[in-house]
Amino acid sequence: MTDGTGALVFVKSLLAEYLSEKYGISVPAEKGVLGRLEEPSPEELEDSFARYAGDVTASRAEATAWHLTGTPETDGYKDLVTLMVPADKLRSCAKDHGVSVTELLCAAMMQAILELQAEKVPNPRHRKPVKVLLPVNLRKLFPSKTLRNFASYITPEIDPRLGACSFQELCALVHHKMGLENNRWTMRAKFAANVASERSPVLRVMPLFIKNIAMKAVFDTVGECKSCLCLSNLGRVELPEVMMPYVRRMDFIIGVQAKAPHNCGVVTWGDTAYINCIRSIREPELEYHFYRVLHRLGLPVKVESNMR
């Protein structure tokens, strides 16, 4: 239905309406808050994938990543570990390594997964690629104002069978992967493959139950199994000044994947970056390794959890 950017606009606008109703304040339509009495514009409802897709498609074939395993939680319970880091120190650390905050966190997560895999799989020849999926907000590359889903992805990866690498080398790998693919030409070719499938005359007349089976098969082949987890960073959240006194904190929590038990959502509110690590298994092994990596980088980290 939408992506992280669209969901944030919805939450901001909903919060503005609540505050207006409860406290009688007037919230201007700015900084991602929509005019609540206005009709949605056609641009907000646009399918920007269909509008900007080109004729050239990129291959969706990728190597399968290593998947973390553990004891499944009962009754659908989800464990959440939130790591809170001073935003200025996180930015400074990223700058020292010549990367963005998102790239630094991606490299740190990859380092944590590499260390965990080394514990679980002692023989390096039996290890699998470590890949972290980074969503890309396509509105920054194309002139779109849609509130529907308009995000693609980039998946930095490293194969531990090729030998050890330093953290700085990991940062460089992530940085150059982002630099190579985070452009409108590469992104257009990526999502053009999906749009071409949607436009297929065969799929248009195919019964829904068959279409669902086919879509699941494709997703299992080129979807979640191709990465260890998703790390999505919404960045710094801004609100109209009149709303600020009523908001203590913001978190960004994404659901776990069907075939991988971990995911990670990041958002910065005020002077703190909130890194929300969610999982559907009991063992907090990845979070422990991730915390250790951040600690080694000299970052002060506070941790809270809902573990039972």
Pin down the residues of each PLM region.
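Histidine-centered acyl-transfer/condensation active-site motif
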Residues: 1-21, 267-286
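Structural preference for long, well-ordered alpha-helical segments in enzyme cores
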Residues: 6-17, 90, 101-114, 174, ...
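Short, surface-exposed helix-loop/turn micro-motifs enriched in polar/charged residues
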Residues: 2, 101, 122-126
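Acyl-thioester-dependent acyl-group transfer interface
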Residues: 82, 91, 115-308
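Non-catalytic, low-complexity flexible loops and terminal extensions
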Residues: 2-92, 298-308
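Hydrophobic/aromatic-lined pockets within catalytic cores
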Residues: 2, 15-23, 95, 109-121, ...
